[in-house]
């Protein structure tokens, strides 16, 4: 796979573009693991973001009914169209965060790491069965962190309100060319049957002061909720559920209780 990569790069005179996060996956075992965990079968329509030189895409095409792959770099698209004769792969040119996604039921992707947050939040708004995504290890640890953990953040809370997330494989820098500066991880994302839809402005306001207790965090971030004079709602904010709990200990269910209380008192809509 490494030899094939260098051959294609040389043939087309391409140098990986670090500005758009081009780090090509070159270890077959990692590709096989991603497809195995995603449980890709002939009935599946798979979305891939960032096909690279087509190594993962090619394996997906052999196992799935249909593959949609989104790529920003026109040079890469030229290679894919010239080098492969897939009849069940559709290449979409564009920015994966901005373009409209087709319907799919599974995701298998080695995404550019700089789009990790917007990609993930866009994905979690979609209907799908499971996703296996390559992330920077640090990002994956934040996604999967539990309440009270050092890495527990707005990302952790918002992700786990909507899905079960699990690191299934840690991957070293040597699995990519060129080598990234960070280690990576494959993450399995499975949407929850009972998703908890949270007010994003409230979550942002709370996690602006993640180490403070809830009542104080809300007072100090009141402007983010459209509160012009915090004195007028001081008693309401002091009586909020879990008022004395530190923000980074809150579960999605507890944030939902806070949201419903604030909505009941017309602090948020």
Swiss-Prot record:
PROSITE patterns: RRNA_A_DIMETH, SAM_RNA_A_N6_MT. GO terms for molecular function: RNA binding; rRNA (adenine-N6,N6-)-dimethyltransferase activity. InterPro entries: KsgA/Erm, rRNA_Ade_diMease-like_C, rRNA_Ade_Mease_Trfase_CS, rRNA_Ade_methylase_Trfase_N, rRNA_adenine_dimethylase, SAM-dependent_MTases_sf. It holds the Pfam family RrnaAD. One of its GO terms (cellular component) is cytoplasm. S-adenosyl-L-methionine binds at residues 23, 25, 50, 71, 95, 110. Transmembrane segments: none annotated. It is an enzyme of class 2 (transferase). It is found in: Cytoplasm. Its EC number is 2.1.1.-. Keywords: Cytoplasm, Methyltransferase, RNA-binding, rRNA processing, S-adenosyl-L-methionine, Transferase. PANTHER family: DIMETHYLADENOSINE TRANSFERASE, DIMETHYLADENOSINE TRANSFERASE-RELATED. Belongs to the class I-like SAM-binding methyltransferase superfamily. rRNA adenine N(6)-methyltransferase family. RsmA subfamily. Specifically dimethylates two adjacent adenosines in the loop of a conserved hairpin near the 3'-end of 16S rRNA in the 30S particle. May play a critical role in biogenesis of 30S subunits. This is Probable ribosomal RNA small subunit methyltransferase A. It comes from Pyrococcus abyssi (strain GE5 / Orsay).
């Amino acid at each position: 796979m490494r030899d094939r990569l260098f051959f294609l790069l040389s043939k087309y005179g391409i140098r990986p573009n670090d500005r758009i996060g081009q780090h090509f996956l070159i270890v077959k075992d990692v590709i096989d693991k991603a497809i195995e965990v995603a449980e890709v079968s002939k009935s599946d329509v798979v979305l891939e973001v960032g096909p690279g030189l087509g190594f993962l895409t090619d394996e997906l095409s052999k196992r799935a009914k249909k593959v949609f792959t989104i790529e920003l770099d026109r040079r890469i698209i030229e290679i894919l169209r010239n080098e492969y004769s897939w009849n069940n792969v559709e290449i979409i040119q564009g920015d994966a965060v901005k373009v409209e996604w087709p319907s799919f039921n599974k995701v298998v992707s080695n995404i550019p790491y700089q789009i990790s947050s917007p990609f993930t939040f866009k994905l979690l708004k979609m209907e799908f069965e499971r996703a296996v995504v390559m992330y920077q290890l640090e990002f994956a640890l934040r996604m999967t962190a539990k309440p009270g953990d050092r890495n527990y953040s707005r990302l952790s809370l918002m992700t786990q309100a909507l899905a079960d997330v699990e690191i299934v494989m840690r991957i070293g820098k040597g699995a990519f060319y060129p080598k990234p500066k960070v280690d990576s991880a494959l993450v399995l994302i499975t949407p929850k049957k009972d998703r908890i839809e949270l007010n994003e402005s409230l979550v942002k306001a709370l996690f602006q002061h993640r180490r403070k207790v809830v009542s104080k965090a809300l007072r100090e971030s009141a402007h983010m909720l459209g509160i012009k004079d915090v004195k007028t709602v001081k008693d309401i904010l002091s009586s909020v559920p879990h008022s004395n709990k530190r923000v980074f200990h809150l579960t999605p269910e507890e944030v939902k209780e806070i949201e419903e209380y604030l909505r009941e008192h017309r602090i948020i809509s």
